[in-house]
Structure formats: structure tokens, C-alpha cells
Amino acid sequence: MQLSGVFLQLGEERLPLLLRGVSIGKLKTYQLYERFKTRTHLAKVNTENLRKASPRFWSRLNDQDEEFATDLSQAILISHMDMVAAVLNFIGVPNEEGFFAKDPDPKQHLTEGWQTRAWERFKDEYPQPLLLFYINHLDWELGGAQQAWLPAAA
């Protein structure tokens, strides 16, 4: 599965919820703002423009624009590094404030049922669409997931 497939399998209704959490300040801090602005074809990146662009973004994901999917996922996740670090710490993946540490094989830490354990631990602490996206992104990135993981009641 490609990264665009993670978005697609989670459903169009979750995309606006993910976009709502994008932090312009964090994009600028991590020097991703200009790249993201260029990739999204927005004259200015703000919450209103992101909300309005959601249908266009969905179309690009449907077209399997992987560079766009990568930049979009970076913008979403960099805006929530506290959650990323918390999940990685919980499942035992070595990291430095949410960024992978120099572990030769971080996927060894993704033991059977890690998705369910992470979901149950954090579903009431972070926005559920965001947590669900990160669990699936991590599974795609490290575990090579071919199918999106969904909790029983999501």
C-alpha cells in the first residue's frame, strides 16, 4: 500500500479533521511551510484555506500523488509531535522527541496487537482521527501494512 492509500482507506470524512490540526507555526519552525504551501498549491496556508482545499486534496490522494501524500502527512504529524512521541514511547520504539532514534530495526518494536494497545491507551487523550492516522502511518512506514487498521468502534 502506498501512503495515499492510508488516507484513502481511512475515508474522506476524516481528512478535514486531520487538516484542522495542522499548525502553521510548527510548519515554520521545522522549515516545512514553504514546501507545504508549494505542494498544496495554496497562495497562503491557513486553517480556512486548508478547510476549503480538502476536496481538492482528496482528489489528489485519489490520483495517488505520493509526493503530496508525503508532504501532507508530514504537516499533520509535525503538528502533533507530542502525540507521536507519546505513542512511540508507549510501544517502545526508541525516539528523540518523536523522531526515530538511530535504531537499526525499529519495526521489531511493533509486536502483535500494538495498534489496539496504542488505540486503547490514547483514544481519549488525542483526537481519534489523528491517532488513527498516526497508528496507520506508523504501521505503513515500519510494518509495511497493506491494509488500514481500524479499531472495532471507530
What residue spans do the PLM features occupy?
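Short intrinsically disordered terminal tails
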Residues: M1, L150-A154
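Short terminal alpha-helical segments
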Residues: M1-Y33
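Aromatic-enriched hydrophobic runs in primary sequence
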Residues: G11, Q147-A148
